[in-house]
Amino acid sequence: MPEQPRRPSDQEQNQSETGPPTNKRRRIGLACNACRSRKSRCDGQRPSCSSCLSLGFDCMYEPGDSATNVIVRKDYVTDLEQRVSSVEHNLQRLNDVLKGHLSPCTNANTSPCHHGTINAGPSMPSPAPTAPTKASAPSGARTGTCATSLEEPQDEEGIPNGMAMTFVEEKTSAFYGEASNINFTQLLLRAIAVAHDSPGAPSGLDRASVLGESVVASVSQSKSSLGGTATPFDSLPTALPSVEEMDTLLDLYFDTAGVVFPFIHEETMRKTYNECRLNGFTRARRTWLGTLNMVFAMASNFDRDYTTSSKKRFERSNIFYKRAMGLCNELSKRVISLEIVHYLILVVLHCQGTSRSVQAWNNYGLVIRSAMALGLHAESTERALNPVQKEYRRRTWVVIYCLDKVLSTAVGRPASIPDEQMMRREPSSGRSPATSGNAADLPGDFLAVSFRMYQVMSKSLVIQYGANLDHDSELDEMAHLKASGELRKQLRLWAANLPPHLQLCDVESDVLLQNTKANRLRVILTMRYHNLSILIHKPLLSATILHLFRQGDAANDASSYLIQLAMAEAHECIRSAQLTIDIVHSVITVDATSKNNLGVWYFTLYYVFTASLVICGRLLWAQHGDTVVDEASASHMRFLLGKAETIFLNLDHENSLVLSCLEYVRRLSRMCGIRETGPDAASASIHDNGSNSTGSADAMSFDLDNMDPFQLFASEMFDPAIFDHFNQSPVDGMSFVNGLWDGFPCGG
């Protein structure tokens, strides 16, 4: 019989009634949208319920219109409070860090952080647009283009370091060797100290203590901005001006700098430019676009038809320069190509015309390494190339060689390319492979003859200046005479073998005033010739000053036969300086525009400034070289310095670099021309100097913005220790140490 189910006893029934209640379904105040639409159970977890997590749905909670009293769990509110508290704590810590980092930047005029912000490049650019964009051009009145399909560079300087670190102001130390103008000026200043019986003057102006010493100048970094405030469009590396402006700048470059330094093939450059212009610059090589911007930067720097104000031209040029930096600055350190080498050469040339002399030298080192890595020095790398490519690779290497000698002379540092590496690398003269028929290649001829002239300069640097190596061995007067005579013979032989269309011109020649491309090259060659002649004969002028300005009995010794010969040969240096000033003065007084035959203004500035220093040396010789003043020579030297002042005043307008050279030559010439140190003599000398010049110091616009380049000049060339205990200054009769350096921003 089946077993009957047992009925629970009364005790068991009572226990079940008083026991814990059974679990009921927990109701939530608001279900998520997915669970409500599926009509499934929702556990109400935030931010995502378990059902949505398992099914991969987006969990969203949206109260309905009738949900006026939504129940929110206490644990959810507690979790929100903890998260808010954590965020507030992190923000407070970050705020404390930023306070320590930004507190030194409150003073915008003196803060190193502020200066670093100004000198930094453009901030991190936004992504390039997907189509050509029209915006304001650098001129502010024209439409512009923005190249696309380019990777935007990242500016690391614009990223905060987050370390609450404050950088102190850096100092720049530079060595200027025996061939530099700075070293020659140091010799003149020591001779001035001897002439005025300064107790702090060296006991003897021997070559080991003067010409052979290291001239190291510590100068502060410039605190002024290098350009005007750029618009967001200008800060884009891919931004370009209007087509009309680009065409004008291209024509200007290939008519000026492209003729003097013909290392870029114009036809190839214009072909690529036209292709990019037709496609709206939607596809362009980064290296080519960077080179194009450097071409624009150079052209706009000496485009005086755009504006006569150098400040405005520089602001415009600096926009293109920064764009080129944004495109190729980092790329040039890891990519080897001919376009990168061209870009770097243009950077070096551009920096020579600005206050970026340190950048010019540093970038030139990168030019050398990139060119050698590309094999421009080797003929074997050209076997698979066509004649045009071979020729322009060779021209690029020759331009680098010429720049090597120019920079080595200007700053007095060892050259990087020995003459042995130029074997069979001379550019072809006559007809270029790019020209058709019998058309002459004027830029190619000019580069070929310039190359041979710079080979003579290279020999002068090695033989006469010890390759600018701070060497202990010194040449005696006989060795200087022999070296100068041999190099002068080579230089004159070079001039005699010039082709008819590139012959040198004299002061009275009509070539100076007939503005043609060939005549401009002839004038430039003439200035280069006289500048090299100054370099060859300057050791003899230095030897003369060393002999004349010796303290004690050495100054009264009878001059030897060799010293007499050195003095006679030193006049060749003075003659070349005089011809340089006369030629430039003849051109600039008739035509002061950029279309004259002088070429790029900053190379003319270098030639005239070098010649002016030589004239100052001859003025010092005439005033203090003997017991009797050579009044005729002193008067003629002052007349030449007056011409040089006219050149500086007309060479450019509102140009701080030109004004710095003018101010420096003025003050140095006053120091060389004062016979006594009394206030009356100083006043008389200043009056005489002003009467011989065409412009007055008061009329010159030399504001605070222009003082920074002069401060660099003065701190590099002046050594205040020379005039220790020299109570009277040769200028204005003021205390030299306590007054001159406080009144003039020369530094120390």
From Swiss-Prot:
Subcellular location: Nucleus
Induction of the gene: Expression is induced in response to 2-benzoxasolinone (BOA) exposure.
GO cellular component: nucleus
Compositionally skewed regions (Low complexity) per UniProt: 131-141
GO molecular-function terms, A-Z: DNA-binding transcription factor activity, RNA polymerase II-specific; RNA polymerase II cis-regulatory region sequence-specific DNA binding; zinc ion binding
Compositional bias per record (Polar residues), positions renumbered to this chain: 11-21, 429-438
Coiled-coil region list: none
Phenotype caused by lack of the gene: Decreases, but does not eliminate the ability to metabolize 2-benzoxasolinone (BOA).
Gene Ontology biological process terms in this record: DNA-templated transcription; positive regulation of transcription from RNA polymerase II promoter by galactose
DNA-binding region: 32-59
Pfam families: Fungal_trans, Zn_clus
InterPro entries reported in the protein's UniProt record: Fungal_SecMet_Regulators, Transcription_factor_dom_fun, Zn2-C6_fun-type_DNA-bd_sf, Zn2Cys6_DnaBD
CDD domains xrefs: fungal_TF_MHR, GAL4
Keyword line: DNA-binding, Metal-binding, Nucleus, Transcription, Transcription regulation, Zinc
PROSITE patterns hit by this protein: ZN2_CY6_FUNGAL_1 (PS00463), ZN2_CY6_FUNGAL_2 (PS50048)
SMART domains: Fungal_trans (SM00906), GAL4 (SM00066)
Region (Disordered) residue spans: 1-26, 116-160, 417-438
Basic and acidic residues: compositionally biased ranges: 1-10
Record's function text: Transcription factor; part of the Fusarium detoxification of benzoxazolinone cluster 2 (FDB2) involved in the degradation of benzoxazolinones produced by the host plant. Maize, wheat, and rye produce the 2 benzoxazinone phytoanticipins 2,4-dihy-droxy-7-methoxy-1,4-benzoxazin-3-one (DIMBOA) and 2,4-dihydroxy-1,4-benzoxazin-3-one (DIBOA) that, due to their inherent instability once released, spontaneously degrade to the more stable corresponding benzoxazolinones, 6-methoxy-2-benzoxazolinone (MBOA) and 2-benzoxazolinone (BOA), respectively.
Additional notes on this entry: Fusarium verticillioides possesses 2 unlinked loci, FDB1 and FDB2, necessary for detoxification of antimicrobial compounds produced by maize, including 2-benzoxazolinone (BOA). The FDB2 cluster arose as a duplication of the FDB1 cluster with rearrangement and expansion by incorporating additional genes.
Protein name (Swiss-Prot/TrEMBL): Transcription factor FBD3
Origin species: Gibberella moniliformis (strain M3125 / FGSC 7600) (Maize ear and stalk rot fungus)
Name of the gene: FDB3
